[in-house]
Amino acid sequence: MLALKISVYTVVFFFVGVFLFGFLASDPSRTPARKDLEGPQD
């Protein structure tokens, strides 16, 4: 049961990390107009 939990958490964290990394890496370059969604500093 512990091995199943570890493998599930590993897969979940892997996909979440890849998704967040890809989103943060590609979003500002593809949609520069959406930079205000990250946090308006102006």
Swiss-Prot record:
**In its UniProt record, which GO terms are filed under biological process?**
photosynthesis
Segments traversing the membrane = 6-26
Protein location: Cellular thylakoid membrane
> Which key words tag this protein in UniProt?
Membrane, Photosynthesis, Photosystem II, Reaction center, Thylakoid, Transmembrane, Transmembrane helix
Give the membrane topology, semicolon-separated if more than one.
Single-pass membrane protein
Do you know which Pfam families this protein is assigned to? PsbI
List the InterPro entries.
PSII_PsbI, PSII_PsbI_sf
Cellular compartments per GO CC: photosystem II reaction center; plasma membrane-derived thylakoid membrane
Q: What does this protein do?
A: One of the components of the core complex of photosystem II (PSII), required for its stability and/or assembly. PSII is a light-driven water:plastoquinone oxidoreductase that uses light energy to abstract electrons from H(2)O, generating O(2) and a proton gradient subsequently used for ATP formation. It consists of a core antenna complex that captures photons, and an electron transfer chain that converts photonic excitation into a charge separation.
Tell me how this protein assembles.
PSII is composed of 1 copy each of membrane proteins PsbA, PsbB, PsbC, PsbD, PsbE, PsbF, PsbH, PsbI, PsbJ, PsbK, PsbL, PsbM, PsbT, PsbX, PsbY, Psb30/Ycf12, peripheral proteins PsbO, CyanoQ (PsbQ), PsbU, PsbV and a large number of cofactors. It forms dimeric complexes.
Similarity section: Belongs to the PsbI family.
Q: Identify this protein by name.
A: Photosystem II reaction center protein I
